[in-house]
Amino acid sequence: MNILIFGPPGSGKSTQARRITERYGLTYIASGDIIRAEIKARTPLGIEMERYLSRGDLIPDTIVNTLIISKLRRVRENFIMDGYPRTPEQVITLENYLYDHGIKLDVAIDIYITKEESVRRISGRRICSKCGAVYHVEFNPPKVPGKCDICGGELIQRPDDRPEIVEKRYDIYSKNMEPIIKFYQKQGIYVRIDGHGSIDEVWERIRPLLDYIYNQENRR
């Protein structure tokens, strides 16, 4: 089973993608994780990507395509791809690769939330500057404001989590996804999921669909 999952900033797509990975035994390919690993390693590519993200801009397609296709070559089948493709150019690159290697996508899941909800979820996020633990001022606050429960490190807001940057990211995402959504609708594999509510509530909107696809494939 090969899945695409996407959604605006704060939609919870990565949380749901990890649940899907565990339930169906898929390989998790997350563009965000791959990009953050490059940034953390302070590679020349990572430093360049960090500049784009700090401004709320999308990373150029040529860079993202190179990173994702390199990962996909090592996986081939039974994957869930999180956060890719996000532009028409990325769709073309992915579709060409899948066609050349005889790989079929089963479903493209779009977890939708409003811009207001996106800002509320993302701008309240805080990261420990020492250990990387994640908190939220509303949903998961630390015991001591501004301090990590685990190591006592200072909690910071990532530059791309500021409200004005989140709004810009949401607008860019929505604009770029319009043709992508239309493409996968024409392919007959697009499914929009309401991303509002708890993690479990959203999961129960996704699970029956994937159980059906998984069972159908196993009957072949």
From Swiss-Prot:
Start and end residues of each stretch annotated as NMP: 30-59
Domain of life from the UniProt record: Archaea
Binding site for AMP: 36, 57-59, 83-86, 90, 158, 169
CDD domains according to UniProt: ADK
A single GO BP: AMP salvage
Cross-referenced InterPro entries: Adenyl_kin_sub (IPR006259), Adenylat/UMP-CMP_kin (IPR000850), Adenylat_kinase_CS (IPR033690), Adenylate_kinase_lid-dom (IPR007862), P-loop_NTPase (IPR027417)
Annotated TM spans: none
Residue positions binding ATP: 10-15, 125, 134-135, 197
Keywords: ATP-binding, Cytoplasm, Kinase, Metal-binding, Nucleotide biosynthesis, Nucleotide-binding, Transferase, Zinc
PROSITE patterns documented for this protein: ADENYLATE_KINASE
GO molecular function, one term: adenylate kinase activity
Family annotation (SUPFAM superfamilies): P-loop containing nucleoside triphosphate hydrolases
Binding site for Zn(2+): 128, 131, 148, 151
GO cellular component, one term: cytoplasm
Subcellular localization(s) per the UniProt record: Cytoplasm
UniProt keyword Nucleotide-binding, yes or no: yes
Region (LID): 124-161
Protein EC: 2.7.4.3
Pathway: Purine metabolism; AMP biosynthesis via salvage pathway; AMP from ADP: step 1/1
Catalytic activity: AMP + ATP = 2 ADP
Domain remark text: Consists of three domains, a large central CORE domain and two small peripheral domains, NMPbind and LID, which undergo movements during catalysis. The LID domain closes over the site of phosphoryl transfer upon ATP binding. Assembling and dissambling the active center during each catalytic cycle provides an effective means to prevent ATP hydrolysis. Some bacteria have evolved a zinc-coordinating structure that stabilizes the LID domain.
Subunit (UniProt): Monomer.
Function according to Swiss-Prot or TrEMBL: Catalyzes the reversible transfer of the terminal phosphate group between ATP and AMP. Plays an important role in cellular energy homeostasis and in adenine nucleotide metabolism.
Family: Belongs to the adenylate kinase family.
Protein name listed in UniProt: Adenylate kinase
Protein's gene: adk
